[in-house]
Amino acid sequence: MNKHFDVIVIGGGHAGVEAALASARLNKKTALINLYKDRIAAMPCNPSVGGPAKGIVVREIDALGGEMAKAADKTALQTKLLNSSRGPGVWALRVQSDKEEYSKYMQKIVEEQINLQLIESIATDLIIENNTVTGVLLKDGEILKSKCVVLTTGTYLKSEILTGHEKFSSGPNEEPTSNGISESLKKSGVELFRFKTGTPPRIYKNSVDLSKAIKEPGTDAKLAFSFSTNEYTPIEKQELCYLIHSSSETKKIIEDNLTKSAMYSGKVESIGPRYCPSFEDKIVRFSSKETHQIFIEPESISGDAWYIQGFSTSMPTDVQLLMIRSLPGFEKAEVKTWAYAIEYDCVNPMQLNPSLEIKNINNLFTAGQINGTSGYEEAAGQGLIAGINASRKIDGLDPLILRRDEAYIGVMIDDLINKGVWEPYRLLTSRAEHRLLLRNDNAEHRLKEKGYEIGLIKQAEYNEYLKYTEEINNAIKELEEIRFTPKSELAIKLKELGQADLSHGYSGIEILKIPTVDIEVMIPYISSLQNLKNNQLQSIVIETRFAGYVKTERKTVERLVKLEKKKIPSDIDYDKVENLATEARQKLKKVKPLNIGQASRITGVNPADIQMLLFYLKNNYATEQK
């Protein structure tokens, strides 16, 4: 086995896979350490990819040259466009994934990737010399040397499983946990804290009756995450999900047994996810509600179990069985896998640079749940950035840092390093102040150029993107030039459908600006709209109808970007900046922002503090500020 690498990635989950692939594709000799090769990119919790904000992250990963979007498209059981009745800033794609096939797909990609070696082992310790990571110690005593290390350990750092009053050391699915890395980080002055998450039970399909459940089909449209996907599963071949509601009996069972839950017995000392609470937590927090939604989802086309979305719990197994059998259609349910909660160590992400490198340990990057986030998509996005930046650091290049107006990935990383996390962080559209610019349809326009410049987007795909963009521009040009009279076929059709009544001549673009007009009706009459992808049509409609809002938003961004260009020297002494609030001074010292824009987003730093900082920089670092 080779013992010298450019980059070592510890952990083969969604963050680790993206980090390792990015590094290897950028011509770095890369090792990916994971205990079992058949657990690469496993889905230990929900068998799905995407959702609000998260689905846009998957598109961003694809635009930068990552793999998650392709894997999700290839292994989708159902595809659904969410929030389609609302504004385009919150549209999002979600797929129900075949978790077995997803993992197999990623395993194949990893094993076939040039420059990438998959090592089946456990990393038990980091080798850190003079505040610089130089390698990794494996469980068999083998030492691997490297220039950079990316930690993507998920929920495996000093993890403990909790069910009822039982608590024991283990990773998800009873896999080994890792304690040594936590101790290494602590010795190097890295602040750690404990978070909690959980997973629901899995129920044998043949033991439940879903005849009275509400069917939840996918969306009947050609939808995909990846720019390169051209094959779509027709709606009639997609798998169904189902919706049921818990009963009043379910609520009573939980209320009667609440002290048996690990959450409410004092066993859990860590903080759980606000946006994915345990079922007993829902009963306590929303005590006035008698019932709660529960989604029944397939895990695999070849699988024999349902995933019970929204029903995670840390109750003992005897109480879990009572809870499950109180659900409509689950009176005779048989459990394949019991629910459990899991506690694990995280790094305080305010100790990270925007590149995701730990500030006080050179060449050590972290990504995924170790940074306090939740979700496969958030992890994959961070993993991609960490892998890219580890590679770029070796080459002596500036890191890739995405701004908040460029990507949801940028919003997430900016939130992590400047605001910190006090509970598992979930990406939401409400976290993005520029969400009209960060849409489901325009990830390619925002990031494909960057992916190409970095080297992850190959020439052939880049040429396809240029063609894609040209087709949109040609269509908009034709819409601006072509005119339709009230007696034209299109005008008559629109009137018949009740979408518009043209009283005089209109250009195609003026017609498209009418909110009630469906662009699909216009396609037969506009040659350049024909054969366009769904995303291209979406972009044309949104850019046309929201042009004024988009223009205003871009002007706002231009002003903010100017603040990003006002650099803060690394040797600044914040104690010498007069009239700074005490909290602001403490936070600035801790975060060490690179520029005024970043400083302005730190929790506890107010506009008055920024003015004092600008005044100090002008008087003491005038040359650097020009």
UniProtKB/Swiss-Prot annotation:
Primary location recorded for the protein, binned into one broad class: cytoplasm
GO cellular component terms given for this protein: cytosol
**NAD among keywords:** yes
- Residues given in the record as FAD binding sites: 11-16
Q: Which InterPro entries has this protein been placed in?
A: FAD/NAD-bd_sf (IPR036188), GIDA_C_N (IPR049312), MnmG (IPR004416), MnmG-rel (IPR002218), MnmG-rel_CS (IPR020595), MnmG_C (IPR026904), MnmG_C_subdom (IPR047001), MnmG_C_subdom_sf (IPR044920)
Family per record: Belongs to the MnmG family.
| Main function | NAD-binding protein involved in the addition of a carboxymethylaminomethyl (cmnm) group at the wobble position (U34) of certain tRNAs, forming tRNA-cmnm(5)s(2)U34.
Q: What is this protein identified as? A: tRNA uridine 5-carboxymethylaminomethyl modification enzyme MnmG
Organism from which the protein derives: Mesoplasma florum (strain ATCC 33453 / NBRC 100688 / NCTC 11704 / L1)
Gene of origin? mnmG
